[in-house]
Amino acid sequence: MTETFEMSPYQPVIDPLVIGERQFTSRLMLGTGKYKNLDEAKKSITASGCQILTVAVRRAQNSTIQSMGNLITGLDWSKIWLMPNTAGCQTAQEAIRVAFLGREITKNIGFENNNFTKLEVIPDPKYLLPDGLGTLLAAEYLVSKNFTVLPYINADPILAKQLENAGCATVMPLGSPIGSGQGLKNLSNIQIIIENANVPVIVDAGIGTPSQAAQAMEIGAGGVLANTAVAKAQNAPQMAYAMQLGVLAGRAAFQAGKIDAGKLAQPSSPIVGLSKK
């Protein structure tokens, strides 16, 4: 006879993620590219439990908004906050123009007060590394126009602080190159950014597994954005669910407070009172 065991009824206190003037209970964000089809994308988004979904404005433009094949028209936006992004922009000026276009698209589908933009300025077509100066220039202008700016950057603590001081609602350092699945290759710098930040730090790019997402959350990241790891998995909805669990576990562990690493072994069983006979 096979025994079954119920999971613990314990419910950890998970604090909300605050970005600008909005609160979110999920700390996992998802991108919308690379899925096999619309149905798989929708199932993955649901399985992830995410509340923030980022869509490339250029891809939304190139698809017919009224088309049933377009992801924008295929989701229940009452449960999801849309974050347009400026992917594909190579200059600050181009990113600014696309950010304004993204804001108009969100209004057209009912997000009247949505000023979110994921700012990407990427002139490097091979490694897809962001332009720090271009990002800062674009961010300063967009903040002045009442955008809630979430900038994608290298794991540069100085730039992260400059963007925070410019009024960005978060900073989004890359863990490793976009789509690489290499995890947190810039761990030390990301830790410095988190330590110095007064805004949420969202680890964006390079997350390949739930354990890597958990690692980011364990060091105090405010959230994680994943795309390729989910969309290219053999079972995308299953991976989306696993990513949700990884983020939840990492955040709960961070709040719990981990033990300090030691050089010597420490017995887990008490030695006081043992018989010496």
Swiss-Prot record:
The keyword Transferase applies. Keywords: Chloroplast, Plastid, Schiff base, Thiamine biosynthesis, Transferase. The keyword Cytoplasm does not apply. 1-deoxy-D-xylulose 5-phosphate binds at residues 179, 205-206, 227-228. It catalyses: [ThiS sulfur-carrier protein]-C-terminal-Gly-aminoethanethioate + 2-iminoacetate + 1-deoxy-D-xylulose 5-phosphate = [ThiS sulfur-carrier protein]-C-terminal Gly-Gly + 2-[(2R,5Z)-2-carboxy-4-methylthiazol-5(2H)-ylidene]ethyl phosphate + 2 H2O + H(+). It holds the Pfam family ThiG. It is found in: Plastid, Chloroplast. The active site is at 118 (schiff-base intermediate with dxp). It is an enzyme of class 2 (transferase). InterPro entries: Aldolase_TIM (IPR013785), Thiazole_synthase_ThiG (IPR033983), ThiG (IPR008867). One of its GO terms (molecular function) is thiazole synthase activity. Belongs to the ThiG family. This is Thiazole synthase. The lineage of its organism: Eukaryota, Haptista, Haptophyta, Prymnesiophyceae, Isochrysidales.
